[in-house]
Amino acid sequence: MTGSMLKRLFAAAALLLAATLLSPAQTGTWSGELDVQGTRLPIVFHLDEENPTVDSPAQGARGIPVEVIRTSSGGVTIKVPSIGATYEGLWMIKRIVGTFRQMGASLPLTLTPGEEKLNRPQTPKGPFPYAQEEVSFSNGDAVLRGTLTLPEGYTRNTPALVMVTGSGLQNRDEEFFEHKPFAVIADALARSGIATLRYDDRGFGESTGDIVNCTTEDLKNDALAGIRLLRERFDKVGVIGHSEGGTIALMLAAEAKADFVVSLAGMVVSGKETLLWQNRVALTATGVPAETVDVYCKALSEVFDACMAGEPLPSVGGYGLTAALAQNLAAVSAQLQTPYLKYFIALDVRPLLGRISCPVLAFNGTKDMQVEPWSNLGALRDGLPDNARKQVEAIEGVNHLFQHSRTGMVDEYREIEETIAPEVLDKMVRWLLCCE
């Protein structure tokens, strides 16, 4: 499963258990972890009798209302009609043992009292030497709500940036396993005299909008609406984007909508190339034999090609894959029916780079296992005009989230206490101040 798709699974799983187990003996906070292909996804239930809720700290999804059906024998059935999910559990004195099901998939979940608190020392804590305003802006039917961070003594000449998250549903802080990288970046920039606008993704948090039929183009236009909001108050407006958000930043720069852009682990090569590389890395890391990896990636490439050509997708059973890999390929084929993934695999910003005339800062981590650093940075260096003001740099030893890491794999994100490498923040601030 790809990193991008895994994040979307996180988003779905954050809601998948959107129900609370409630009985007189089951009040307070209960938590457990889903094992999503080797990555732990914490789920936290707050068992208030009147307003039970569930949180998914990994996705920054909190306070989701839930409903529950109990039996006299200690069983519980939890239904989530909005996503077609059901959880069935059994009270076992000091734990609740159960299984959730959605779209034919089943995963075990055991809950125990309390909630694990993760140490995140870089998360900003007040009082702050800058102002924050809650704002909203619209793109068609989508209403985006977010936070405008304003440095002390700001004027129209203060540089300002729209912050665009990566793929998958995320809140304005781009929260992931209780890390809040966008909050950390906004804090660092505000302390250096730079304003930012960060917002909840459409259809998530406090924002509304269609997420079923949207594509990266729609997400780009959401960010463009944020640029328009900032231009009402600031003369110099740029974009800072992470992962898919970095791709969106480059798309906006090519359309001359931004005065400067920062791409953090942005995808420059095509979505197809990125997903194939992600799959190869993930399968190899889990010990799948090289020959099997080659066969699976060949099959995946042919599925992508057929989708982009508008042809019927190849039969999953024709590649001699193991049952698990055949099931995964079938799941990918099903997801290719969605507008988002159809658009994403064909997305390639390389032809757009020659149109960019504004300053560009691009970082990729050398241990990024979701967006391959060298091909993407190389494409930027080669594609941007020779006269463009550009800084394209590989940051040594950091992963896709720009944490210092051992392997760069997704399963380390939660365990690392650092949210973002200080040298990345420092380089970003110094570059932005030089753009003034």
Where does each model-flagged region fall?
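Conserved alpha/beta-hydrolase "acid-adjacent" motif
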Residues: 369-375
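Conserved alpha/beta-hydrolase
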Residues: 184-206
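Alpha/beta-hydrolase active-site loop
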Residues: 213-232
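Short, surface-exposed "cap/lid" segments of acyl-processing enzymes
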Residues: 153-157, 161-188
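N-terminal cap/lid segment of alpha/beta-hydrolase-fold proteins
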Residues: 116-156
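Short beta-strand/loop motif that positions the catalytic acidic residue
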Residues: 356, 362-364
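Central antiparallel beta-sheet cores of small beta-barrel/beta-sandwich binding domains
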Residues: 26-91, 97-102, 122
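Accessory cap/linker subdomain of secreted extracellular hydrolases
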Residues: 264-355
